[in-house]
C-alpha cells in the first residue's frame, strides 16, 4: 500500500479499494490457499465488485512493475544480529531489544529519511550500547557496510525514540508486546541518558 501511494495520487474514496486489492496481492504472494476475491468484497460490505478489485489489483501490479519483494528493516536486522552474535556472547535480550527499537522506528515518520539497512544497523548499535556490550566491530562494518561514524545521526534518532518511549503514551501495543516476559521485557529496560560521541569515532 505504502509503495503504491508513494507513486500514485489516490482520492480518499478509493483508499479502501486500494487496501483490499493490496491484501489480495499479499495473500496470493504469502498464502498457500489465498482467500477468494468475493471474501475481500465482503469485508468492504460489498462496496466494490469483483471486477473493480481485479482492475485495481492489475493497476497496483503494473505501477509496481510486478516487483513485490523489497528489503525491510527486519531483513537487514536478522543479518546484522547474526554478525554481532558471531563475535561476542549475546542472548535473546539483545535480539529482542534491537527488534523493539526497529518497531519504534517503523512508527516514526522522521525515520523515512534513512535506508532500512541504515536503521537496522543503528538499532543493533544502540541495543549493544544499552546492554553494555562493545558497540561495533570490523565484522559488523563488513556485513552492514557502515562505519560507526556513518551511523551517528540515525543511531541518535533511534536512541531518542527509545528514550521517548519511556514517557510517551503512544505506541502502547509495541510497549506491551515487548514488555512481556516472552520478549525479556525489553520495553521496560532503563534507557541511557545519551549516546556518547566517542562510540562513533573509536579510533580517536
How would you describe each model-predicted region?
Residues 1-20, 24-204:
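Acidic, serine/threonine-rich low-complexity regulatory regions at protein termini
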Amino acid at each position: 500500500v505504502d509503495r503504491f501511494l508513494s507513486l500514485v495520487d489516490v482520492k480518499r474514496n478509493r483508499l479502501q479499494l486500494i487496501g483490499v486489492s493490496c491484501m489480495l496481492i499479499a495473500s496470493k504472494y504469502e498464502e498457500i490457499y489465498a482467500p477468494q476475491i468475493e471474501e475481500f468484497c465482503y469485508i468492504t460490505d460489498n462496496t466494490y465488485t469483483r471486477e473493480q478489485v481485479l482492475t485495481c489489483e492489475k493497476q497496483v501490479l503494473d505501477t509496481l512493475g510486478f516487483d513485490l519483494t523489497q528489503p525491510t528493516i527486519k531483513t537487514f536486522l536478522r543479518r546484522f544480529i547474526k554478525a554481532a552474535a558471531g563475535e561476542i556472547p549475546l542472548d535473546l535480550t539483545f535480539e529482542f531489544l534491537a527488534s523493539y527499537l526497529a518497531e519504534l522506528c517503523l512508527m516514526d515518520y522522521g525515520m523515512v529519511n534513512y535506508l532500512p539497512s541504515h536503521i537496522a544497523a543503528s538499532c543493533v548499535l544502540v541495543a549493544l550500547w544499552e546492554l553494555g556490550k562493545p558497540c561495533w566491530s570490523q565484522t559488523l562494518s563488513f556485513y552492514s557496510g557502515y562505519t560507526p561514524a556513518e551511523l551517528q545521526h540515525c543511531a541518535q534518532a533511534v536512541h531518542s525514540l527509545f528514550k521517548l518511549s519511556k514517557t510517551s503514551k503512544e505506541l502502547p501495543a509495541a510497549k506491551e508486546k515487548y514488555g512481556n516476559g516472552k520478549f525479556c521485557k525489553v520495553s521496560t529496560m532503563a534507557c541511557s541518558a545519551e549516546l556518547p560521541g566517542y562510540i562513533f569515532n573509536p579510533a580517536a
